[in-house]
Every structure is written in C-alpha cells, then in structure tokens.
Amino acid sequence: FFPRIYDKPEIFRQEGWHYELHDGKLTQSGVVFNEMKGAFSSPEGVLEREILNSLYPDTTYANESGGDPEFIPDLTCQQFLDFHGRYYHPSNSYIFLYGN
C-alpha cells in the first residue's frame, strides 16, 4: 500500500510518461503510455472497449484501467498520488476466506 513513488517521483516519469528526444524529434514515452498506445491500436482492444462501454456505461467496466493514451500525458504525479492515497488503502479492501 506504500509504493516507492511517494519518495521517488522519478518512478512516475519512467513508468507513467515522459518526453524523449530521438534524432532531433521530441516524442512521448513511458512504460504505461507505450503499453496503452499498443492496446488502443489493436482492433481487438478497440472492439472490447466499445463492447464494454456499450454494455456497462455507468460502471468501472466502461473505463480502461490503464488509461487512454490521449489523456495519460495530462496526468500529474500529484494527481496520481492523490488517487492512489484515496483508493489503494486497506480500508477499501475485502478479505474472503473459503474452505473448510
């Protein structure tokens, strides 16, 4: 529940998104950003998102958990930390035990 990003904000820039300069051209990059670009460019991914959005418009299933690459660069490290602090907390979890 307490990832290193709280004391190492450079993790956000590496994992989330950042700018890179290649051959004089400035591009956006980052682990999550690139993964989501790939997911949003696959026909199967587009179809799945449209189906889920149509079937479950007012639920979390209508949203892509990794984020839309068009909007990922708008996310700031502080917004990410605020979201994490609010939702990724033990008080928001359930524990289920099953068996004999």
Where are these regions (language model features)?
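Charge-rich, well-structured scaffold segments of protease-associated domains
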Residues: 1-100
